[in-house]
Amino acid sequence: MTWIDPLGLAVDPITKLEDRGYTGVTKTSGGGLDYSNSHALYNKRPGVNPVVTIEYSGDYDIDFQRANAKAGLNQVSTPRGYVWHHLDDYDPVTNKGTMQLIEKQAHRGINHNGGVSQYKTATGIEYTHPARNSGARGCD
């Protein structure tokens, strides 16, 4: 038997994304979201790869810097209006996972499981992020 939302308040993340105009996002077998076939994926500059594999650090800012470098952005900060999404394919043996550079509006307020929650389960370590104190939120 599956859970039924008695008040009808739970919103499927794919439905929420489609309501925002983002199509092509798929649910992974682990309950995460894969943006690789969505127009939410960064495509502003030629030569930039918006899907990269990095070694997880336990710190959002460090992960974002690593992903920026690996993507070929040649900058420390993530492009304005975009955020790096930790796909839910974290490998505890290699400590690596896939990052996808997507529009913030396709990530903000969309509940999903991601590589960060897999990292926490595998290591027992919480991810850190200075912006979290100001209300920003990364992947779980």
Residue ranges of model-derived segments:
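Intrinsically disordered, compositionally biased low-complexity regions
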Residues: 1-14
